[in-house]
Curated annotation (Swiss-Prot):
InterPro entries: ABC_BtuC-like (IPR037294), ABC_TroCD (IPR001626). The keyword Coiled coil does not apply. GO terms for cellular component: ATP-binding cassette (ABC) transporter complex. Pfam families: ABC-3. Gene3D superfamilies: ABC transporter involved in vitamin B12 uptake, BtuC. This is Manganese import system permease protein ScaB.
Length: 278
């Protein structure tokens, strides 16, 4: 099977596009996911990934690139959630739940109005084997941009993630870096739709980062390890999907989950097996 997969990479251009895109998404989602779980924003990641759905549907209706609509609605959802949380007694999880369900419902209504149901199905559940050249290059461009922003603002994102009160006392614009991270999260969510769809994007963000957290002792190490795990799971999941003719996006997610499960038992920081033995 491995030989057939390698031969397929040599013969089929669509598989080459899928492999490159999968690696890029795995690396970038793994990096951004580290900040998401450190801030306790896993639910926010899920909300943003689903909030882009009405933007995608509206883009199909209007005949424009789905990146435009998805990014617009993703950022809009982030702004609404932050505004509700900051201007009412409602807690963040409640604000996220209200916004998430509302945007999802709007997306479903727009899907029923849109004509291109096949393309929308791919957006919902992913079809990385159908990635075109333009989509691949957009993914690469977004990936480079996201990693560049993380590199430039690493110290600020680090401090605002671990101790926002201290960061604010030092004069840092905490809200600015919050929205900056939301922009990065939205960009990654839109890009990852091609591989796993809006339904499973949060798994690409959270699972590799959570696995890396079990091993890493510093944020830099965590980001590097999470990106490597994300890329590795993407390649292995693509191989499984192509070889066994199953959904590649779901295979990527399950591969990442399996790596986490193994790490849960053997990671030094977890020490689950040692505690059970004792």
């Amino acid at each position: 099977m491995i030989q057939e997969f390698i031969q397929g990479l040599h013969d089929f251009h669509f598989l080459q596009n899928a492999l490159i895109t999968a690696i890029v998404i795995g690396v970038v989602a793994g990096a951004v996911g580290c900040f998401i779980i450190l801030r306790g924003m896993s639910l926010m990641g899920d909300a943003i990934s689903h909030a882009v759905l009405p933007g995608v549907a509206l883009s199909f209706i209007l005949g424009i690139n789905f990146f435009i609509g998805a990014i617009t609605f993703g950022l809009l959802a982030s702004i609404i959630i932050t505004y509700i949380k900051g201007n009412s007694i409602i807690k963040s999880d409640t604000a996220i739940g209200i916004t998430f369900s509302s945007f999802l419902a709007l997306g479903i209504i727009l899907i029923s109005v849109a004509k291109s149901s096949t393309d929308l199905f791919h957006i919902l559940f992913g079809n990385i084997l159908a990635v075109q050249d333009l989509d691949m290059w957009i993914s690469i461009g977004v990936g480079i941009l996201v990693l560049l922003v993380i590199s430039i603002f690493f110290k600020q994102l680090l401090l605002t993630s671990f101790d926002p009160l201290l960061a604010q006392a030092m004069g840092m614009k905490v809200n600015f870096y919050h929205y900056l991270l939301m922009i990065l999260l939205t960009l990654v969510s839109v890009t990852a739709m091609q591989s796993v769809g809006t339904i499973l994007i949060v798994a690409m963000l959270i699972t590799p980062a959570a696995t890396a957290y079990l091993y890493a002792k510093s944020l830099k190490t965590m980001i590097l390890l999470s990106s490597a795990l994300g890329a590795g799971a993407s390649v292995l999941g693509l191989f499984i999907g192509y070889s066994f003719n199953v959904a590649a996006g779901s295979s990527i997610v399950l591969t990442s989950a399996l790596i986490f499960l193994v790490s849960f038992f053997i990671a030094p920081k977890q020490r689950y097996l040692k505690r059970k033995v004792k």
